[in-house]
Amino acid sequence: MGMGAEHLRNQARAGLLDAIPVSMELGLRMLHAARTRLADAALTQASNETRFDCAYTAIRVLADLGLLLNGFRASTSRPGHHMAALQNLKHTLGVDDSTVRVLDSLRKQRNLAGYDGDLVTATVLAECMTQARALLLRVEKRLEEEGWLGEGRR
């Protein structure tokens, strides 16, 4: 376990996270899903809302992958599991606080778009895609360090 191990254990004791076995197979499937969603987000013939949803889903999957790398998943038996995954990025992947706040604002925007029908602006879409790409690069670097990616594995 890495950088925020004690914090993550405390989150598990509070019922916000569940301890799970680290699984390279699951992690690589999650990475593939995130890459696919990010590629879908780049399809300009889709609406901004669809593209935003794809980019946000990539962020969420990558945040979940960060938890997996540390032997946890967000507890789905409680509300707020997306928020828990994002807010733990500091402890799972070393994401700085200001970026976590941006990602949380994108989560809130996703809820407004998904539940209230708010339209997604080109600016918000671009920010979501930029954040998804940056998080993907961070995850890929971590997976290379863990030996999950490398020659013939990418």
Task: Label the predicted regions.
Residues 1-154:
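Terminal alpha-helical segments
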